[in-house]
From Swiss-Prot:
GO terms for molecular function: 4 iron, 4 sulfur cluster binding; metal ion binding; oxidoreductase activity. PROSITE patterns: 4FE4S_FER_1, 4FE4S_FER_2. It comes from Methanocaldococcus jannaschii (strain ATCC 43067 / DSM 2661 / JAL-1 / JCM 10045 / NBRC 100440). The keyword Transport applies. It comes from the Archaea. Signal peptide: none annotated. This is Uncharacterized polyferredoxin-like protein MJ1303. [4Fe-4S] cluster binds at residues 50, 53, 56, 60, 80, 83, 86, 90, 110, 113, 116, 120, 181, 184, 187, 191, 204, 207, 210, 214, 229, 232, 235, 239, 266, 269, 272, 276, 295, 298, 301, 305, 352, 355, 358, 362, 382, 385, 388, 392, 412, 415, 418, 422, 451, 454, 457, 461, 476, 479, 482, 486. CDD domains: MtMvhB_like. Keywords: 4Fe-4S, Electron transport, Iron, Iron-sulfur, Metal-binding, Repeat, Transport. InterPro entries: 4Fe4S_Fe-S-bd (IPR017896), 4Fe4S_Fe_S_CS (IPR017900), Fe-S_Ferredoxin (IPR050572). SUPFAM superfamilies: 4Fe-4S ferredoxins (SSF54862). Residues 39-70, 71-100, 101-130, 172-201, 195-224, 220-249, 257-286, 286-315, 341-372, 373-402, 403-432, 442-471, 467-496 form the 4Fe-4S ferredoxin-type domain.
């Protein structure tokens, strides 16, 4: 079996000096010494390693061997019973069952941590992604062919995880220019699909819907010209925040002036339609269509929406009461009526169909339809923690630690779940909607019975707050780097997310 993601040796570069033949390291090498899982061996004075083909994981009866976020594999020692099946099925025989403290478990499985790449003095250890990106994939084929000949085995190409790395992913959606937006929230109030989520605001936002609906041009932004006003009350009815009311034959503004930008909006990723079991949502040519008559209100779309735009909204109707009796509004006369809102029904809202109503009605031309491009991330601020891959709903992200890159596969639909949760904000975020770890309801700890003191957690922690499994929880930001890199899954991580203020 041949692996999809793996670290290989450029054979012409490995141990190229003649003095290597008489070196005391002739039976070992720097990469072997550094590998925390003993996944590298020497053959004909060249380094070879685990193929990350996944045969061990597929044949493990206890499902104790699993793929991690970097394309390698880890052994969950709580599940492993040391049966040795993984060693028996390994096509190159690198897996060995060892015993420590009365517990048997396998060694020799690559976790794709990239340590061997860093310590190689000849730059001979590289990831298969680097070869692919530099159009040198032939070196990987040669490496595998030499291994076949030396070990006298046939290595067939294994089934890889669905999705191949792509240069970029594109998506069309509206975009609100936060620098131009004045916070009137007209876009939110006019959107027929409730797809632009307003901030909770109890004030007059100067949306001027009152002025646009006044037949006599008697009001603007809640300020009334009483010489023109005919008390038709269209302004009172249309005001989205109930900022206007009638007192003594005059329409008056009863709430303060305040502006606020939308908190989030639909980016047309199509995740909701993809997860809808009833067929009430369809995503066609970048447009999202919803038919409420076949909706089960199962909330799957609400749960999966990365921007929390898909949501339940309760419809109300205003009731007018006089002396305990319901009255039609038209019969107000001189009677003193009390009004209240009564819930009518719940409905699922949110989901942009690109109708452009928001674009055509924005007074500052702050909204446009744009093509968002998501390309591989190679940023010095990226800590390669793996959070993006953890939260991705389509398993479309690869963390290439050896090259310091975050890669996207053709499974990616640019839903930006990764960007919303990224602790370093290195992934483009269209809406600016952000979630952070809720520290009070999250926890991280290390089971020291399974920690092998390999030091990988020390190496990857961006805050230097872990020392061979011992975590300083006050400094920890719950980024998950140690959790994702741990080759024995000795680190437990549970994260709850909350919207960033």
């Amino acid at each position: 079996m041949r692996g999809g993601r793996m670290i290989i040796t450029i054979l012409d570069e490995c141990r190229v000096e003649e003095k290597c033949q008489s070196c005391p390291f002739s039976q070992t090498s720097k990469c072997m010494e550094a590998c925390p899982t003993d996944a590298i061996f020497l053959l004909n004075n060249k380094s070879f390693s685990c193929l990350t083909c996944g045969e061990c994981a597929r044949n493990c009866p206890n499902k104790a061997i699993k793929r991690n976020e970097f394309g390698g594999y880890y052994v969950d020692r709580r599940r492993c019973n040391g049966c040795g099946i993984c060693a028996n099925v390994c096509p190159i025989g690198i897996i060995k069952i060892v015993e420590k403290d009365g517990k048997k478990f396998p060694m020799g499985i690559c976790s794709m941590c990239g340590v061997c790449v860093e310590v190689c003095p000849y730059n001979a250890r590289v990831s298969s992604y680097e070869l692919l990106n530099t159009k040198r994939e032939g070196l990987a084929e040669r490496y595998l062919k030499v291994l076949e000949n030396l070990m006298k085995v046939k290595l067939f190409r294994a089934e890889e995880k669905p999705g191949k790395v792509v240069e970029k992913v594109e998506r069309k959606s509206i975009k609100i220019d936060r620098d131009k937006c004045v916070g009137c929230l007209r876009c939110s109030y006019l959107c027929p699909r409730d797809t632009i989520v307003p901030d909770s605001i109890d004030a007059c936002t100067s949306c001027n819907l009152c002025g646009e609906n006044c037949p006599k041009d008697a009001i603007k932004d809640g300020e009334v010209d009483y010489n023109k006003c005919i008390l038709c009350l269209k302004c009172v009815e249309i005001c989205p925040n109930d900022a206007l009311k009638v007192e003594n034959f005059k329409v008056i503004k009863v709430k303060e002036d305040k502006t606020s930008q939308p908190t989030s909006y639909c980016i047309n990723c199509g995740l909701c339609a993809e997860h809808c079991p009833s067929g009430a949502l369809r995503f066609e040519n970048g447009h999202l269509y919803y038919s409420p008559d076949v909706c089960w209100k199962c909330m799957e779309c609400v749960k999966i929406c990365p921007n929390d735009v898909r949501r339940i909204k309760q419809d109300f109707r205003r009731l007018y009461i006089h002396k305990g009796n319901l009255m039609p509004k038209a019969s107000m006369g001189n009677n003193k009526l009390y009004s209240c809102e009564s819930p009518v029904d719940d409905r699922v809202v949110g989901g942009c169909s690109l109708c452009e109503i928001c674009i055509n009605n924005c007074p500052e031309e702050a909204i446009s339809i744009t093509t968002v491009k998501l390309e591989k991330i190679k940023d010095e601020n990226c800590i390669l923690c793996g959070t993006c891959s953890n939260v991705c709903p389509r398993d479309a992200i690869i963390i290439d630690r050896s090259n310091g890159e975050v890669l996207f596969t053709d499974n990616c639909i640019a839903c930006e779940t990764c960007a919303i949760h990224c602790p370093r904000d290195v992934i483009p975020n269209t809406t600016g909607y952000k979630k952070v770890v809720d520290r009070e309801n999250s926890f991280i700890r290390t089971d020291m019975d399974f920690c092998i003191k390999c030091g990988l957690c020390n190496k990857v922690c961006p805050n230097n707050c872990i020392d061979y499994g011992v975590i300083d929880k006050e400094r920890c930001e719950f980024c998950g780097a140690c959790y994702n890199i741990c080759p024995t899954k000795a680190i437990y991580l549970h994260r709850k997310w909350k919207v960033k203020e």
